[in-house]
Amino acid sequence: MPLLDTHSRVTHRPEPGFALLALVQATLIFTITLVAVPLPLIGVEFDLSTADLVVLQIAYGLPYSGLLLLGGSLTDRFGGTNLMRTGLWTFGLASLGAALAPGFDTLVAMRGLQGVAAALVAPAALAQVAALFPQAEDFDRAMARWGGISVLGAAMGTVLSGIVTTWVSWRWMFLVPGVVSALALLTERWLLPKVLSKDRGQSLDLFGAGLALVGFSAGGYGLAMGSETGWDAPSVLAALVLGVASLTGFAWHERRADAPLLPADFLRDKGRLAGAFGIFLAAASMGLVTFILAIYLQSGPGWSPLATAGAMVPYLAVLILGGGPSGQMVIGMGTRNAMILGLVLSAIGLWLLAGFGPNYVVEILPGLVLLPAGTSLVFAASAVLMTQGVSPVRMGLAGGVMNTAMELGPTAGLAGFMALASLRTEIEAGWSLVFMSAGGVAFLLAVSACFVLKRLQVTGAWK
């Protein structure tokens, strides 16, 4: 059984260390959406097709989601400190490379390398949080806040990218994750405990990691490109078949592997499974809002990038102001009730956004206020559900699964919902159908949570 050697250099309150980890986590999610607003400008500079822009959009999320389970396994084996340092160095250098990219191919490669690095950092950061808050009650409170941090990062990417690209080049956006990486590397020695694993003898499931990477990447690519090039395109069909085959092989292999990346019994817990679905849907909803509104406001009413970013400020404000109360509500009213309330609010917000139009105050703003209020609760409750009952030596696995759900939302989830838009001849009618459908899924999950989480209990640490 792995042992965790946690030698803390933190002699004061853990809040500064948690703040640093929160900044890192928000930046990892921020990096997903930082290209949302400047995509048209990048397309003009490099003379890109719509399909090229889709590739650029998903180049970060696909390796991130595909390698997170391996990142969790590496964290449990080598410890959060070593993995986070390695990941931050790589993340920072890749961000600098993206800022200086001379062409499209280099930019896509650097976005992909950012995703690889993020897959190391995310589960390692969660292991550090567990070391900062060793008491179960304190850790649950921390995780309730942690869930809201991720959704905040996504909204900040959309808002800041619009502001930055209005005044300077889009390339400056990639310096933000580079600066955060440097700050974390300079300060973690004094703010964070040293988390090292003593058991390095257990073999790594590299074959399973390869299947997961190919499955998530190929499947996500096929879903993303299907709506652009057509679902009958040979490249799309090949990617989807490869993705399904790889993920099927992954599931079969994990049930038989000696040291699986994702032990079969981990997601048998109803709470963890509900948390994974909640995170996936909330992340997909966020992706829908930022993607659709960023395109609509610039191509429909003809708003500037700065005005488009300004349109998302209320969304960001609700996330900032609601982050603390959401965590308190999860602890006060319980994860089940918080999850149900959050899903219902999210559903109503998405349904309101289905009526989007040029009148921002009447047709967009109400949904932009209600949706983040709901997703904040969903993320906070889901983060607690995903980590309750997990022993500290397996927190890397929990972080890997949680962040995989987070990354699949804006990639595979977004692509899956956007595929529904092709059922309508008019693009705006298709987008309205997407919002309605996402709201329907959120409401169905809320109803399901009423029964699935009715007798939720934590029976002990998952080892």
Where does each model-flagged region fall?
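12-transmembrane solute porter fold
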Residues: 14-37, 50, 167-168, 234-242, ...
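Structural signature of transmembrane alpha-helices in multi-pass secondary transporters
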Residues: 21, 28-29, 57-60, 64, ...
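Glycine/proline-centered helix-kink
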Residues: 36, 123, 145, 150-162, ...
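Extracellular/periplasmic helix-loop-helix junction of adjacent transmembrane segments
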Residues: 36-67, 106-107, 301, 306-311
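Membrane-interface helix termini in secondary transporters
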Residues: 41-43, 72-73, 77, 163, ...
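Central cavity-lining transmembrane alpha-helices of secondary-active solute carriers
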Residues: 58-72, 122-126, 313-326
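Helix-loop-helix hairpins in multi-pass membrane proteins, especially solute transporters
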Residues: 80-206
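C-terminal membrane-cytosol helix-exit motif in multi-pass small-molecule transporters
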Residues: 178-197, 213-225, 241-257, 445-455
